[in-house]
Amino acid sequence: MSQKRLVLATKNQGKVREFRSLLAGAGFEIVGLDPDAPEVSETGDTFEENALIKARAASALTGLPALAEDSGIVVDALGGEPGVHSARWVPGSDEDRVRALLARMAEVPAERRTARYVSVIAVVLPSGREELFRGELEGRLAEAPRGTGGFGYDPIFVVADGRTVAEMALEEKNGISHRSRALARCLERLPALLEEG
C-alpha cells in the first residue's frame, strides 16, 4: 500500500520531524511547508479556529490534505489566559513567559492554580472537508520552575503525580501529553477521512 501524503501546516522542520516520529508506521508521508510559503496570521479566538486557519491555508497552497495544530495553556484563575496567545503572550523567551505567568499567579492559593494544556489538530482535505481533534492534559501551576526537560510552560505545569512536565522523560511526556491525545483521536479517523475524500 502506498503512503498517503499529508502536508503539516508549518515551516518548522523540528515540528515536521516530531510529527513524522509520532506518525511513524501509520502509512503517511508527512511534508512541511516550503520556507518561502506565505505567513498565515493566526487571528482566531480559539485553538480550533487557529488550527483551521492554518490547515485551510496549507491545503489551498499545496492541493494536499493538510494537518495543523494549535495549542497552549489555559489557566482557570486567569479566565483562560494565556490561551491561544500562549506562545506570544509576553515578548521574549519561554523563561520570560514562565516568569510573567508566575508573577500573575503569585497571590493565587494552591487550590486555585488549576490549568490545562490544550491541543487541537485540524485536518482539511482538498475537497473542503474539515475535522477537528482536541486533546487536553489537566494539571496545576507550580510556584517555581522545576526540571530541565520540555519547553514552554513545562517547568511549571504539574501533573497528577506531582512532577512538572519538565521533570519527565520525553517518552513519558509524549505518552500523556495533550498533543499525543489529540493525535491519537486524529489517527482513529484519518485513514477513513482520506478514503472518503
Swiss-Prot record:
It comes from the Bacteria. Its EC number is 3.6.1.66. CDD domains: HAM1 (cd00515). InterPro entries: dITP/XTP_pyrophosphatase (IPR020922), ITPase-like_fam (IPR029001), RdgB/HAM1 (IPR002637). It is an enzyme of class 3 (hydrolase). GO terms for molecular function: dITP diphosphatase activity; ITP diphosphatase activity; metal ion binding; nucleotide binding; ribonucleoside triphosphate phosphatase activity; XTP diphosphatase activity. Disulfide bonds: none annotated. One of its GO terms (cellular component) is cytosol. One of its GO terms (biological process) is nucleotide metabolic process. It catalyses: XTP + H2O = XMP + diphosphate + H(+); dITP + H2O = dIMP + diphosphate + H(+); ITP + H2O = IMP + diphosphate + H(+). Its cofactor is Mg(2+). Substrate binds at residues 10-15, 71, 151-154, 173, 178-179. Keywords: Hydrolase, Magnesium, Metal-binding, Nucleotide metabolism, Nucleotide-binding. Mg(2+) binds at residue 70. The keyword Nucleotide-binding applies. The active site is at 70 (proton acceptor). Belongs to the HAM1 NTPase family. This is dITP/XTP pyrophosphatase. It comes from Symbiobacterium thermophilum (strain DSM 24528 / JCM 14929 / IAM 14863 / T). The lineage of its organism: Bacteria, Bacillati, Bacillota, Clostridia, Eubacteriales.
